[in-house]
Structure formats: structure tokens, C-alpha cells
Amino acid sequence: SKGGGCCKTPEGNYLLGPSAKEVWNKEDTSCDAEGIAYALSCCQHKGVGEKDVIRSFAGVRAADFKEDFIIEKSEVTAGLIHVAGIQSPGLSAAPAIAKMVENILLEEMKKEGMSYKRKENYQPYRPKRRVFRKLSLEEQNKLIKENPDYGQIVCRCEFITKGEILDAIDSPVVPTSVDAIKRRTRAGMGRCQGGFCLPVVLQILAQAQQQDCTEIDFTAKDTNILEKIKN
């Protein structure tokens, strides 16, 4: 896949890279000096330097040697549909890929004699979340009067309130980690990368889910930040 891009996020941050470096270990998501230098070189015209970088990360793309998408039912496992090898056009192709998967699924259900119908109360859209920092001063004051949690700034870098974090926790798909809260609300996404707000987010998440702080994960399962001290 191609590498070496420079794009601006809706929030105003720049994303640099990737390097598109091939690795042999599928678990290797490390960053190295060579890759970071290459990513920085992709955005020299924007005057971005090392001092401006607040986080570096890497991922591994499971590309196919045929350089093509794999969208098909499994020949081994019943009920499994492969959607793999999705590369650069994946975002643009997502609606069409979803339709292909739907057609494969319906075809397989038909073969098995299974019936189906559209869910009557299906809601394809989720309510738009309130972004406190984008509201006018009058709207902010009104919201704080209705719910004082919106008057408590948890993440100072991104101006994220306790109310927004609780809204995210109260969503149909419940975030269960600090990283999930960051992705939903941007708390911890700023310059300090959670250095200030992480302990508060951890506490809010633990209280909302009636868990101990030592049970809250940072990212995936069993990545808890705190550990109980055994006497």
C-alpha cells in the first residue's frame, strides 16, 4: 500500500505517514526513528517538526499478496464471512462492501431455509452528541444549569466535560476502557496525552460502571492501569 501522506483532521491536528514499511511479524506495531523521520518529511511544507509531535503509533495491515480485497464466505467455518485485505480505498468502498456482505449473508440464509425480515424499530442513526466546546456561551450556560456535570472540565487540552464523558458511557455501545472514552469524546487526545485527565476519566468510568479503579482497562482486556497492592 502507498505511504507518505499528510492530512488535517476535523479538529485541526495533522496526521503524518504512514511509512508503509513491510514487517514479517504480524504483532510488530513498533515505531522506529527511520519511520518517524519519513513521516515528518511528508509534511515539511506545513512547517511541522519533531517538537510538534504529540504521539506516534503504528498498525499492521493484513494485506493480500494478490493486492485485492477478499470478500467471501469461509469455506471452512459456517457463518463466517471474510472481509480482509482491505487497503487504501477501504473507507470509500465501505458502503459497497457492506452491501456485498449483506447479499452473501442473505444468500446463505436462503440456502439454509432461514427466513428474515427488516426490524421494525431499527434506528440507522444515532443521536448527535453534544460537543460542549462548540456551543455558544449562552448554550453552555444553559446546559450547565440543566446539568452541572457540563460545568466540570475534565480534559483541559480538548475542553471536554464530565457531562460529555457520562453521555458516552450512557450510549448503547458502552465504552469499557479509558482509550474508548478518548475515541468517543477526545478526552486525553490533546497535547498532554491524558497526563492531566486520565486519573479523572478512570475514576468517572469506574464509578459509572460500579467497578474498582483497578478493574478499568487502558485499551484492550487485561490492560488495567492500576493494580491492587497485596499486603
Give residue ranges: language-model regions.
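Iron-sulfur (Fe-S) cluster-binding segments and ferredoxin-like electron-carrier domains
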Residues: 27, 161-172, 195-213
